[in-house]
């Protein structure tokens, strides 16, 4: 699934703080920052706010989707 976030920097800060167990990988050649969670979920966040979810079903994904929807309403 693909989503768009109006404030990717705040999302990245939130994920780093809320999910310290996730591995945060440095931006790749196209600038995407990647979070890899212990349950197999992978979230790629691109500089312009595009978010790609990969991996198996995860309750974290639902939490992040809800957060992005709230952030986009600001």
Label every model-predicted segment.
Residues 1-3, 48, 71:
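Detector for methionine-enriched segments
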Residues 1-42, 64:
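Short Lys/Arg-enriched alpha/beta "domain-start" segment
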Residues 41-63:
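Intrinsically disordered, low-complexity regulatory segments enriched in Ser/Thr/Pro
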Residues 58-74:
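Mixed-charge, Lys/Arg-enriched low-complexity segments
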């Amino acid at each position: 699934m693909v989503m768009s976030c109006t404030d990717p920097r705040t999302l990245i800060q939130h994920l780093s703080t809320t999910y310290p167990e996730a591995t945060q990988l440095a931006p790749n050649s196209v600038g995407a920052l990647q979070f890899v969670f212990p349950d197999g979920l992978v979230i790629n966040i691109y500089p312009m706010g595009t978010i790609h979810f990969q991996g198996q079903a995860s309750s974290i994904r639902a939490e992040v989707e809800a957060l992005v929807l709230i952030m986009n309403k600001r």
